Every structure is written in C-alpha cells, then in structure tokens.
Regions:
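Active-site bordering "gate/hinge" segments
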Residues: 1-258
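Short, glycine-/Ser/Thr-/acidic-enriched flexible segments
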Residues: 45-46, 115-117, 161, 223, ...
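Glycine-rich, charged/polar anion/phosphate-binding loops
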Residues: 140-141, 203, 212-214, 245-248, ...
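Short solvent-exposed loop/turn micro-motifs enriched in small/polar/acidic residues
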Residues: 209-211, 254, 270-273, 306, ...
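Long, well-ordered mid-to-C-terminal structural blocks that present hydrophobic/aromatic surfaces
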Residues: 251-307
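Active-site lining segments that contact anionic ligands and/or coordinate catalytic metals
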Residues: 258, 274-276, 283, 308-312, ...
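Dual-mode signal for accessory low-complexity, basic/Gly-rich regions
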Residues: 288-359
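Extended hydrophobic packing segments that form well-structured cores
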Residues: 365-410
Length: 410
C-alpha cells in the first residue's frame, strides 16, 4: 500500500532499533533476554517498518514472529467486511487454544499502529463492534496475566499514513516530522535519550508514590473531578510500553470517583471518531454522558461490563513532551505536551501493576474489584489538554498542589 511519503531507510532502521532495544523492557527497566521470541504485528500500510523491525529483532539476537495485517483499501475493507457477513456466533467466536498458545510462546510483543482509514468501521453498528471486543476477553486475560507476572514485555509505536495525516490536518511529511520529533529520532542515539527521559518520569512517579496520596481533585474550566487513590497504590511512568511516552499514571479506586469532565480531544476507537465527550461520575460510575459525534459508540462502550468505571488517571508534563498538536491517534494524543500538558482518564480496565505491594497470584477478579481495581475488556483513554490544577489530599489530611499549568509541582 503505497503512501505519498516514506521516511529514509536510515531513519526507519533507527526507529526499529529504538522500538526493539528500548521498547522491549519492563516498567522497572529490565531488558528482554537475548534469544527471546518477539511477536510483531504490523498493518500492511506500514510494510517498510515491518522490514526493519524484523531486521532489528534478528540483529539483537531474538526470534521474530511477524503478523502482517491487511489494511482497508477501497473495495477491500477486510475489517468492515467481517462485521457485514459474520453471524452472531462468528462474532462471538474466540480461538482460545490458538491464542493461549501464542501468548505462551512469546516473550515480547510489538504492535505498530498505521491506519489506512481511521473511519473503516463507520458503517458498522457500534453494538456489534463491542460484542466482538467482549468475546475476545479471554485472550486479553491470558496476555494480561503474563504481563502482570513480568514474563511478557510489550510496546506500541506509530507509523504515519496519508489517511492519518489528513485526519490530523497535515501532509504526510509534516506528520512524520511530528513522529521524528516526538521519538527523538534525529538524536545520535535515541535509545540513550529515551533512557534519560525514562529516568526523569520514573523519579516523578516515585515522588508521587512516596506522598501517600489518598485522593486528587482536578479543577479547571472543563473539569471538576475528585478521584480516590488510596495507600495501596503506586504511580508508574513511561518505560518502553508506549513509544513515545512521557506520562505518569496510577489506577484510581474506581468506587471513589465523583464529578464531571469534558474531554476536548477526539477519541478514535473501533474505526470511528467520538467528539465533544462529557462524563459525569457518581460513586465511581458514569451516570450521564454526552458527545457531539458518535454518542452511540460511547454509550456502547459504557454499557460494556466495567466500561462505565475508571481504570487509569494520568498526567503529562508539558516540559517533557515534544508533541504539540493532535495526531488523530490515542498513542500520541495521550502524551500531548503543548501549553498545558494533558490529563487523561481511561474508561475500563485497571493496571494491576499499580498495586503497591506483592499481589497474591491466587487473587481473583472479585478480590481486585474489592481493592478498587476495575476489570473490563475495554481500556479507552479519553483526553483533555485544557488548563487545570490537580490538588492531592495526603494521608495526614493535608493538601498539596501536585500539578499546575501543565507542570508537575512536587
């Protein structure tokens, strides 16, 4: 699938090297062992990066397991065609043994995002899309358990396409310049640069954890939201799980979220675009929602089990992020710096890695729920870049401003 611009081979080679060498590590910075099996999933629109990823995996002493996914192209919209012709039992089908075998086999997972058509599923009923997502939950559970046990490293990165650039109001070359800048690909050694950035955000996360924050109150023209955190939470940051990533995040106690937030960034999900989103929470549950576009998809997401509760609260310091405008892709939009950084929350599944302690592997979902860690097949990051202040209430009852005007203040 030919694009109007393809980055030079030297740059793609450097990008692939960054994805493998920096992306394949856990949140503690431990690198994946040589000889590991790395699965890399690449859409057809990103074929040039597939070539260099395979090479980088081999050069670093690992075993590549590539998955090449057809991109929607004119009459050959494979994704939409599945939903058009699949019966309910086919939408609900999951090849459990096959998926479990894949997860058991791999030590690392790389996913490349490259939309040939951000609206590929616009004609498909949202309910059917969510039905499919729900049916795949067992496969996600296999993967999640392996990640939580520290036995599976994963990362996500972006390959620019004409369709994505158009959606963001740029030429493809301009779009790629944003990727290059955000990932520091013009640096002599991007891996070294990212190791330095990672140390900075990890230090911020550790400081927040040491504060023993009980709750945060987010206030601004578009938000008045209080989220319970609790003493059994830690804050995490960066790592190689997303490239790029400047965010610092935790999992709130889903039962203790109250207030309102308007999200000024569009939300791209399931081949559709939600705009003008507003959410109202009472005792941890979304009790009211609005959207100026595709509200029916938002409603379907909220009706998915656990989809109406929060699994993540995140902040990005504007001083670190090189992303200055919307890229029409959540991976980048949740890391926007700009003038005021960004706040994003995630509807759906929590990060159990944010538990501050050593979890018992026998703990069931119900026990995690009792600890305030939400469970869901969805994890939908929704984003605001407007000016806001975040005030924390600490264990001793005192308050402290931890984030203001786009900067951490701790």
């Amino acid at each position: 699938m030919k694009q109007s611009y393809t980055p030079p081979a030297t740059l793609l080679e450097k990008y692939a090297d960054l994805i493998v060498r920096f992306g394949m590590q856990n949140k503690d910075g431990k690198k994946i062992k040589k000889g590991s099996v790395i699965q890399f999933t690449v859409p057809e629109a990103a074929k040039p990066l597939y070539f260099y990823l395979q090479r980088a995996i081999l050069k670093n002493g690992h075993h590549p397991m590539g998955i090449f996914v057809p991109s929607p192209d004119g009459q050959y919209n494979v994704q939409a065609d599945f939903y058009t012709h699949a019966a309910k039992k086919q939408v609900d089908f999951i090849a459990k043994k096959f998926i479990k075998g894949q997860v058991d086999q791999i030590d690392g997972s790389i996913q490349i995002l490259a939309e040939a058509d951000p609206h590929a599923l616009k004609s498909i009923e949202s309910k059917k899309i969510m039905q499919r997502a729900q049916s795949q939950n067992p496969g996600l559970s296999y993967r999640r358990r392996k990640i939580e046990s520290g036995k599976l490293d994963w990362t996500i990165a972006l390959y620019g396409t004409d369709a994505m650039a158009k959606e963001a109001g740029m030429t493809l070359k301009e779009y790629w310049q944003q990727i290059i800048k955000a990932c520091y690909l013009n640096d002599k050694d991007p891996v070294a640069t990212w190791n330095t950035i990672n140390k900075t955000v990890q230090t911020t996360a550790k400081k927040l954890t040491k504060l023993r924050i009980q709750s945060v109150h987010v206030v601004g023209s578009d938000v008045d939201l209080t989220l319970g955190i609790g003493s059994n939470r830690k804050w995490l940051a960066g790592g190689g799980c997303n490239i790029p990533s400047y965010e610092v995040f935790t999992t709130p106690n889903w039962t203790d979220v109250n207030g309102w937030i308007r999200l000024n960034q569009p939300h791209y999900r399931y081949g559709k675009k939600i705009e003008g989103m507003e959410l109202w929470f009472e005792s941890g549950v979304v009790v009211k929602s609005k959207a100026s576009k595709n509200h029916e998809l938002l409603e379907s997401m909220l009706k998915t089990p656990g989809g109406n509760k929060l699994g993540e609260f995140s902040l990005t310091d504007a001083r670190l992020s090189k992303i200055t405008k919307s890229m029409a892709e959540i991976l980048y939009d949740e890391n926007i710096g700009g003038t005021y950084g960004n706040t994003h929350i995630a509807l759906g599944s929590a990060y159990r890695e944010c538990y501050d302690g050593t979890p018992d592997p026998t703990w069931k979902t119900a026990y995690w729920e009792a600890l305030g860690f939400n469970s869901s097949v969805v994890h939908s990051d929704v984003i605001s870049t407007t000016k806001r202040t975040v005030t924390a209430t600490l264990e001793n009852g005192t308050t402290k401003v931890i984030y203001k005007d786009g900067h951490f203040s701790i």
